[in-house]
Amino acid sequence: LVLPVMTAIVESRSSIELDTRYQIGKENKSELDNRLFFDLINRKITQPEEAEYRTASLQWPSEPVRMIALSLETEKNSFLLEMKKEQQTKAISRILEKNHIRNAVICSKEMCFALMGISINDTLLDIIVNDMIQKTVEINNCACSAIISNPLSDYLKLADTYQKLKEGFHIRMIRKQQWQYIFLDELQYDRIMLHISKDTEVHQFIRCKLGPLVEYDRAHDTQLLETLEALIQNHNSRKLAAESLFLH
């Protein structure tokens, strides 16, 4: 009687220790994922060999990869991602693992990023992104949108893509766009316009040319600026601009 009891105690303790070690390993993996991600986006890694070694050691997906960025609807709610980082990371990773997709998921104070391979078709990608958005909304109790990057041939391009994704969410906010998710390519025109608008000389020229229009619009409530904005958002298509203004 004593032997089976002792055996059960030892097995129970061993199981607890193994489970504890497993949990510690999972936590360390998450920390290492975050460290590597921020080393890449801050350009602390400059050699392809180092990027290849470190991503392989953490079992990140092989290149080429795609990055999906998730952002909460309003900046004032961005702190929720930090508060629920562990829950968010596990939930997004679980969605990808359920579809047998190798992944790395990193949550920052501003956004949640999912790195994955590019072998899946558009239909499955649509399902996965919508599942990610829905799960993020459930966890944070806040509306969410997503941007899907272009395929990256190597991890050293992560820094540039990260900046483009941040610009994409900034454009969505300032232009009051309503998409739930979008491909980064579709924001190329808006991103170019954003960069042009930051140029001091261009900014002064626009103020000089549009200054009188702004004054006239305010004085007579002609909604000329709203019409101009609709034209810009619809890539100068009068038909689409008219439809958006009518629906608005």
Predicted regions and their residues:
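Cytosolic nucleotide-utilizing catalytic cores of signal-transduction proteins
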Residues: M6-H248
